[in-house]
Amino acid sequence: MKYHIGLIPDGNRRWAKGRGLEPWEGHIKGGEKVELFLEWCSDHEDIGEVTIYLLSEENFRRSAQELGKLYKLYEDELAKLMNKEKIHKDRIRINIISTDAKPIPKNLSRLFDRMRTKTKDYNNKVLNLLIGYTGQSEILDSISSPLNRMKNLLFGLRQTDLKRSLKVKTPCDFIIRTGEESEEREAKSGFLLWQSAYAEYYHINKFFPEVTEEDFNTAWDHFKNTRRRKGL
């Protein structure tokens, strides 16, 4: 069985602030940890799909300076990802998913299109990168699609109709969230709200730039043991 694992990488800005750095310096360090996470996932044959929450719709309200630095970081890191031999050798399909793409610069949108096109026929593993996304909008977009509006008028809308129109089709099995908190909390922040209805959840109580491979191993052991106890 192959699992779908999600990552909510929280704490880049707080990590930077605590060190007297600019917010984007935290994002740069976080980018290194995304690369570590992807390498870790690729070492697990039972992980078939990965979804990473990089930028929510709400994040578009951040300063123009911070967003500009973020867009440049995405451009550099995604171009590097696209040239990785492992992506093509392992036939990993890359989906860049947005529920609001209007604020995204044109050059970045073109890069997204090239990545989708270049990997669209790959079917061994899937990597979903959520940029300008929120689960509430994804569900509303699905309900209000022309086909679903027609079905709702004529027959009534079913869950299968809604799921078929979602941008991420596969149920999420396990969500890892990072972020230093005074007490553990389960907060999805709009991440795959429909798809994660039955997902297991694990909180790493560290800012994302501080996480290690061992943290991911501990999280994965928790997930596998929990699933084993449930007989799944």
Give a label for each model feature.
Residues M1-L232:
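Flexible, compositionally biased loop and terminal segments
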